[in-house]
Structures are given as structure tokens and as C-alpha cells.
Amino acid sequence: MKKTGRLELTWVGKYDDKVIEPRILLEDASKSYGDPSSENMLIHGDNLIALQALQQDFSGEIKCIYIDPPYNTGSTFEHYDDNLEHSIWLSLMGERLILLRELLSEES
């Protein structure tokens, strides 16, 4: 007997499209070091905006991405509140995971 159903996570706001203003990445030469011909980048900033900025030039080409997403620990920190409703947190993570998948190369 074949089962054709599939499991899907659903939450409030999952399908709400958000428009984020496009940005470009600017190099800060004072923070660069090492081999100037290196293909590696370290980007300091909001990871969602940075991932979107990478899309135009690097879609499907990146081998490894490390981001520091909101973890939803339930704690409040000095610079941000990490205590979101789960539906809001899932929407935040969903946006980032979709961009990550689009940026990563096949061999990643």
C-alpha cells in the first residue's frame, strides 16, 4: 500500500510575503586581511539582508554559509529580545532557510 500524503509545518504568517529593500555589500578594507585574491567573505550585519544581497551575484555558487539566526531561547538580551511567538520565529527562519538553499551550490 502506497502512502501519498506529506507532512508540512504550518503556522500563522507562513505564506505572508515580505518585501525587503535591496542592499549592496561594501567592503571595509580596514577589516580585510590575508590574501586579497581569496574567494572567502566574512559579512557583518543582519543575516537576512546580507543573504539577499548575495543572491544577485552568488546564487547557486556558495559552498558554505554560517549565520547566527535568532534562536528563540525565550530570553531577553541587551540588544534584542529572543522571546518571540513560535509562528513569528518560524517565519523569520523560513525566510533565511529559503535564501540559504538558493545560494548554496549543488556540492554543498
Feature-to-residue mapping (PLM):
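DnaQ-like (DEDDh/DEDDy) 3′-5′ exonuclease domain used for proofreading
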Residues: 1-66, 73-88, 95
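Conserved Class I SAM-dependent methyltransferase catalytic core
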Residues: 86-108
